[in-house]
C-alpha cells in the first residue's frame, strides 16, 4: 500500500504517489456510511448559482421565477448533483429546469430521458420536486452537457 501526500497541495493519495484530488484513492473503496453537504440556494435576479465546490445536494425555495441556473466550479471528470425545489406558499413560480449556463454565460445543454421530454416543475404551493444531474466531463461541461433525471415530483 502506498500512502503519499503532496506538499503544498493538501492532498493525500492512497495507492497513488501523485494524488489528483484532496483525497485520491486508487482502488476499490468500501465505506460504512457517508454524508454530503446540503447547500441552500437563493434566487438573485431570477438566477440561481449552483456552486459545486460547496455541495452536491441543494435545496431551493421557489420564492420567485427562475430563468436560469449558473453552474460554478464543476470538478474535472464525472460528477452529479441534486436539487430539491419547493414552491413557496404563493406557488405558481416558473422554474427553468432546462436553462443551465456556466459562469461565463455559455449555455450548458441538458439531456432528458424519453427522447428529451422536458419536465415541468410542479407549480402548486408548498409542493416539492427533486431533480438530479450528471456530467461525464466537468472540465468541458458546456460541450459535454448535463444528463437530467426526475427523482420525483409533487411531493406533499
Predicted regions span which residues?
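Predominantly extracellular/luminal regions of secreted and cell-surface proteins
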Residues: 28-52
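Short carbohydrate-recognition loop motifs
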Residues: 54-60
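Flexible, charged surface loops at secondary-structure boundaries
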Residues: 50-54, 74-77
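Short, surface-exposed charged micro-motifs
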Residues: 22, 47-49, 132
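Intrinsically disordered, low-complexity boundary segments flanking structured domains
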Residues: 18, 41-49, 117-121
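Acidic, glycine/polar-enriched metal-coordinating patches/loops
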Residues: 60-156
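Extreme N-terminal basic, low-complexity initiation segments
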Residues: 2-7
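Short sequence segments immediately N-terminal to proteolytic processing junctions that release a mature
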Residues: 8-36
